[in-house]
Amino acid sequence: MRKIIHIDMDCYYAAVEMRDNPQYRDIPLAIGGSADRRGVISTCNYVARKYGVRSAMATAYARKLCPDLVLVPGRMALYSEISQQIRKIFLRYTDKIEPLSLDEAYLDVTDSELFSGSATLIAQDIRRAIFEETQLTASAGVAPCKFVAKIASDENKPNGICVITPDTQDAFVKTLALGKIPGVGKVTLQKLNNMGLFTCQDVRDYPLDAFVKAFGKFGPVIWDRSHGIDERELSVSRKRKSVGVERTLAQDITTDEECLAMLESLYPKLLSRLEAASPKLAIQSQGVKLKFNDFQQTTVEHRHQVLDKTYFKTLLSEALERRGTRGIRLVGLSVGLPETADVQQMVFNFEHEQNR
């Protein structure tokens, strides 16, 4: 039985700013772009979340929810530097590490002899080391597989740990709301709910063939997760060709302005994933993908060796010329990596993005 730890830093960017600026600790704080430039919230502290502020929210709307919100632009170079410091802490415990972004990673400690092989004690010690050396808190999930560990890390946030043992995993999974499953976003969740499916137990009681017919290739994934099955290994050393983020929309968007706002929302996520995969931000291309409401899609990708948000806007304009009168149901950004990048291809779907 495997022992997987998911470490997730607590409101990472905001936590760094509060650490370095104590005056921010007890006030609503967010990292993101300004409202007058159609900015988007990258993350916020827990004080701001009490007002309903969330990541990927338009800054202008966040200001309406919380007029006293303090907004700072963020310091990505510093966040990346601290992330590398945290990664070095991970390496003291295992070399089987799959970074997901600057603020979260999977660790496989199945073969570790530290703490007599106790994944729980290893996770506790990792959290201790992170706090002692960075003055930042991390939450941890411990489980026999990746997706359960990821869900568990969110159970006792902030600054908590949740352990799901092989004996308790089935009971934990079957009561989960389907929206908790990574990859199940608003669109998929609404379809599940319309079928009368709300928990993993509901999926278990549903005929498999009918379920797969309804959801296509994603059907077996939801089915497996609902049964607590996730046999994916950690991605630690294969060649990554690209990094991308995309979001499927609950409602089609129809204007260029809405597409630009979505680009602003996705860009910080892409930057975070890229910095985890390629700390020097080495790229060889940038691309934009649009999927239309007739399920046709278009991708515009050009060689570009310096990451540039403005260039994404140029690519988006080119892609929008192919739209005609169709609505847009998915927007994606991607970068191609040099062949020397010792990482693997991955696209992240943020239709279900959780607030950390």
Swiss-Prot record:
InterPro entries: DNA/RNA_pol_sf (IPR043502), DNA_pol_Y-fam_lit_finger_sf (IPR036775), DNA_pol_Y-fam_little_finger (IPR017961), DNA_polymerase-Y (IPR050116), DNApol_IV (IPR022880), IMS_HHH_1 (IPR053848), Rev_trsase/Diguanyl_cyclase (IPR043128), UmuC (IPR001126). Binds 2 magnesium ions per subunit. It catalyses: DNA(n) + a 2'-deoxyribonucleoside 5'-triphosphate = DNA(n+1) + diphosphate. Keywords: Cytoplasm, DNA damage, DNA repair, DNA replication, DNA-binding, DNA-directed DNA polymerase, Magnesium, Metal-binding, Mutator protein, Nucleotidyltransferase, Transferase. Pfam families: IMS, IMS_C, IMS_HHH_1. The record marks 13 as: Substrate discrimination. GO terms for cellular component: cytosol. GO terms for biological process: DNA-templated DNA replication; error-prone translesion synthesis; SOS response. Gene3D superfamilies: 3.30.70.270, 3.40.1170.60, 5' to 3' exonuclease, C-terminal subdomain, DNA polymerase, Y-family, little finger domain. Mg(2+) binds at residues 8, 103. Its EC number is 2.7.7.7. GO terms for molecular function: damaged DNA binding; DNA-directed DNA polymerase activity; magnesium ion binding. The active site is at 104. It is found in: Cytoplasm. Its cofactor is Mg(2+). Poorly processive, error-prone DNA polymerase involved in untargeted mutagenesis. Copies undamaged DNA at stalled replication forks, which arise in vivo from mismatched or misaligned primer ends. These misaligned primers can be extended by PolIV. Exhibits no 3'-5' exonuclease (proofreading) activity. May be involved in translesional synthesis, in conjunction with the beta clamp from PolIII. NCBIfam families: PRK02406.1. Monomer. Belongs to the DNA polymerase type-Y family. This is DNA polymerase IV. It comes from Pseudoalteromonas atlantica (strain T6c / ATCC BAA-1087).
